[in-house]
């Protein structure tokens, strides 16, 4: 089965930055326990613009992790499946 991915974009103000970084750390810990890989990237030219990536080995694992997440994903039903390029 193909890997599954969801993406979320978040904008934070300079005053929210430290609190948001702590939130990202909590997300990383939670998703690691749920067997989901989590990454966060900040746009180089726009501080405070973040992309969060959630990847699991299958859509079911990803959906289950999102359903139990302490911080809900804005659109957990928008799931991308890996394209097999052979």
What are these regions (language model features)?
Residues 1-86:
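Short S/T/G/P-rich N-terminal loop/turn motif that feeds into the first structured element of a domain
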